A protein has these predicted regions:
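Conserved C-terminal structural/oligomerization subdomain of aldehyde/semialdehyde dehydrogenase
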Residues: 89-243
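ALDH superfamily catalytic-core signature
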Residues: 1-109, 132, 172, 240-241
């Protein structure tokens, strides 16, 4: 929940979908709602909750949700509903304040727009799975992610997933925090970028190491320069013998 609440999900490492064991949907929705609303009991008109950057981006997020619902997805809002106009406006994103409450999208499929591009908003698709191999296959089927988040206490299962997938960075049992750790490099791999900054690696990445070669006054390299003659032939013959 924290990863989608920070800046209303408008960060490059906000989670774009959740892979959830089938049968835990209701439990997850309740836990997500509790976690999302603990620091932010109300999203509408809350100055501590970020707005969507532009009206155009807000319209894009609305379209994503409408398309998903039209294709059979179920949307659960983290803002309480009701008969009041304020609640209704908040659900679809207030056009004046451009705030949109976090929303879970169940029954999301790969054919939906929100599963085909970076969401960059407070919408979180949920994909149910039956086997751990389904998790690995789903992650590896898409572009290599900038961040991957694992939640669970079984270290063997965790290590199995992390060893079989590729991502820019990982946070275990939380989100976003590998970005903030001063001793960890941050960066992507493949489609999510290349190279890293932060920490010692960042200093090297963002510094230029100027190469300087100083030729000594007496150098054997001059014997290898043209024009080539008998002396060069003798040198090459010796090199062939010893090498």
């Amino acid at each position: 929940a924290h990863g989608k609440r920070v800046n209303a999900g408008q960060t490059c490492i906000a989670p774009d979908y959740v892979l959830l064991p089938r049968g835990q949907e209701a439990e997850f929705a309740e836990a997500f709602r509790t976690a999302a609303r603990r620091p932010c009991p109300r999203f509408a008109g809350n100055p501590d909750y970020a707005a969507i950057l532009t009206k155009r981006h807000l319209a894009r997020l609305r379209q994503m949700l409408r398309q998903a619902q039209g294709m059979g997805a179920h949307v659960e809002w983290m803002e309480d509903g009701g008969a009041g106009q304020e609640s209704a406006d908040m659900a679809w994103g207030d056009a004046v304040e451009r705030q949109m409450a976090p929303a879970l999208v169940f029954n999301a499929t790969s054919q939906m727009q929100l599963m085909q591009e970076e969401i960059f908003g407070p919408i979180l698709p949920v994909i149910s799975y039956d086997r751990l191999d389904d998790v690995v296959s789903a992650i590896n089927a898409g572009p290599r992610p900038l961040a991957l988040y694992w939640f669970g206490r079984d270290e063997k299962v965790r290590d199995a997933v992390l060893s079989r997938t590729i991502s820019g960075g990982v946070t275990v049992n939380d989100t976003l925090l590998h970005f903030a750790h001063e001793n960890l490099p941050f960066g992507g791999v493949g489609d999510s970028g290349w190279g890293a900054y932060h920490s010692e690696q960042g200093f090297a990445r963002l510094s230029h190491q100027k190469a300087v070669f100083v030729q000594s006054r007496w150098s054997g390299a001059s014997m290898l320069y043209p024009p080539y003659g008998a002396r060069f032939d003798r040198i090459m013959e010796l090199m062939r013998r010893w090498l």
